[in-house]
Design a protein with these regions (language model features):
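Small-residue-enriched alpha-helical segments and adjacent helix-cap loops
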Residues: 1-2, 94, 105, 271
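Anaerobic metallocofactor- and corrinoid-dependent redox/one-carbon enzyme cores
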Residues: 2-57, 193-523
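Electropositive, gly/pro-rich neighborhoods at or near active sites that engage anionic ligands
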Residues: 35, 41-220
């Protein structure tokens, strides 16, 4: 798959899409204050078997939209703060009534937020800057970084909880963990060791949620298997579906199944083609474009409406307006929100758009894997030869630098090391090649399966960063003591400070040179 594309042009980096401006950061600091207050009272109620569903939805959606999102806008901020200013006083009153009934004194949280007063943008930015400077002054760099890490893990948990909800599965333990994480921020300074323990607890739960999500997907759509996916476009009206929530792709396909409108997937949504059920939809034609790294060009050239499913991390400020839709909790300026699974506006937009006039013939790629068959092939190799080490190479990072590194790694790794590569491939006796495509669960699935069955040392390489990567790396390191190495990531997900802290606290390393990394791992 990797040789189909040229990623010299990365719009994510070159247009600043993967960076966060100070104005946005300040507004997000203020929203964290609302989250902390909400969690304090929601946790008190939860401990007494009371779940406020409105607050639950607000907290989960705020974190899934807020963390590591460079396109978070002032409009988003106003929508969220208005909702909290409406619901928080009600939540506090609910808590007071509970305390009244129990005959206990309410434990109020001290906060600079005034719930009954709307913050204008200027005052909000000033408050956010003040909160940021307070953290810099009062917290050590390591503690600040651990808080950032735990927020990224919280985002991963929230996304998994919300995705499970689309399969009508309620993950109460996931919501409870989010409340515990947020409430830990209400302590003046939690010790680094306590934060580390909380992080380890959170990543174990997150992995459980990810397993539950995969089970739900396979129960609904069938067991994953290898499948051919076409990049060919066909003359017809078309819709592009973006993101990772395949349940929402199903909703789109159901909405257009009796219409002459084709559907194409983009980026992580490609994984849907590995589930048998989606092959039954004649409207689903294949994959379009080169992924998030090239989203500006992909979106600008697609001749129809684009549906951004929940949690899609795209900056659309530079994109053509009028054909962008989202199912997310909040929508950016110019992006039309889809509510109650009503895709009628999307369908009309597709019918009115020019669509593909001639189409373009492109090659087909084989993606996906059958886990049991793949493990069988791996175990056969382990029986045939005595291997001293196992390398697992995760999903492709799609940069020339990454390509060069892993091409060299696969060639220079000694023959007594078995390599399971989920993306890059070189034909060698000690390499098992699989194209896991955008399957973020694949790396953990194989690492966990092999760690539980064999005592051979395992090293896991993460070429690509996504919203689940930090959680997965810490889980594998702490649960199975695997070596974990991470490639260069966009600063919005993992900056150099965080990499240093991951190294010092969890012994997770950044990639250096192939020779040095091999020497360090195999010494």
């Amino acid at each position: 798959m990797t040789n189909n594309f040229d990623y010299r042009y990365d719009s994510c980096i070159s247009r600043g899409i993967c960076s966060m401006n100070p104005r946005t950061s300040s507004l997000q600091e203020v929203l964290v204050l609302y989250l902390k207050a909400s969690a304090h009272y929601a946790l008190k109620l939860y401990e007494n078997d009371i779940v406020d569903e409105k607050i639950k939805a607000m907290i989960l959606n705020t974190i899934s939209v807020l963390v590591s999102n460079p396109q978070f806008s002032e409009t988003d901020f106003n929508v969220f703060t208005h909702a909290y200013n409406t619901e928080l006083p009600r939540l506090i009153k609910e808590y007071e009534e509970m305390c009244n009934e129990k005959g206990t004194e309410p434990e109020y949280l001290k906060t600079v937020i005034k719930y009954n007063k709307e913050l204008d943008i200027i005052n909000a930015i000033q408050l956010g800057e003040k909160e940021f400077l307070k953290k810099v002054k009062e917290l050590s760099q390591e503690t600040q970084d651990l808080y950032r890490i735990i927020f990224v893990i919280a985002k991963s948990i929230c996304i998994n909880v919300l995705d499970l909800e689309t399969f009508e599965i309620d993950s109460k333990d996931g919501y409870l963990m989010i409340l515990k994480i947020l409430d830990s921020l209400n302590v003046e300074e939690t010790k680094a060791e306590c934060l580390k323990d909380l992080i380890i607890e959170a990543v174990e739960l997150d992995n459980k949620l990810m397993k539950n999500l995969r089970t739900a997907q396979e129960e609904r759509y069938g067991k994953q298997r290898v499948n051919d996916v076409s990049y060919t476009t066909i003359p017809a009206k078309a819709i592009l579906v973006v993101g990772s929530n395949i349940r929402e792709l199903e909703d789109v396909l159901e909405a257009v199944k009796d219409k002459e409108i084709d559907v194409y997937t983009h980026d992580e949504m490609m994984i849907a083609h590995t589930f048998p059920k989606f092959s039954e939809y004649k409207n689903l034609k294949g994959q379009y474009g080169q992924g998030i790294e090239n989203c500006l060009l992909d979106f600008a050239t697609f001749p129809g409406p684009i549906v951004l499913t929940r949690h899609s991390l795209y900056n659309v400020e530079n994109l053509y307006r009028g054909l962008l839709y989202t199912t997310d909790f909040a929508s950016s300026k110019g992006v039309i929100q889809i509510k109650n699974k009503d895709f009628s506006d999307v369908i009309k937009a597709a019918e009115d758009a020019k669509g593909f006039k001639t189409g373009k013939q492109c090659e087909t790629v084989s993606i996906g894997y059958d886990y049991h068959n793949s493990m069988g092939s791996i175990e056969k190799k382990l029986k045939q030869k005595s291997y001293s080490h196992i390398f697992i190479v995760g999903l492709n990072g799609y940069t020339l630098e990454q390509q060069a590194y892993f091409d060299k790694l696969l060639k220079q790794t000694p023959d007594d090391v078995l390599i399971i590569s989920l993306s890059y491939c070189t034909q060698k006796e000690n390499i098992v090649c699989l194209n896991a495509c955008f399957d973020v669960f694949a790396t953990v699935e194989f690492a966990e399966g092999l760690s539980e069955k064999y005592s051979i040392p395992i090293s896991v390489f993460y070429p690509k960063c996504d919203r689940h990567t930090i959680s997965q790396m810490i889980y594998l390191k702490e649960k199975f003591n695997t070596d974990v190495l991470i490639g260069k990531c966009t600063p919005i997900l993992l900056n150099p400070n965080l990499i240093n802290t991951l190294d010092s606290v969890f012994n997770i390393k950044g990639l250096t040179s192939v020779k040095k990394d091999l020497d360090d791992i195999l010494k």
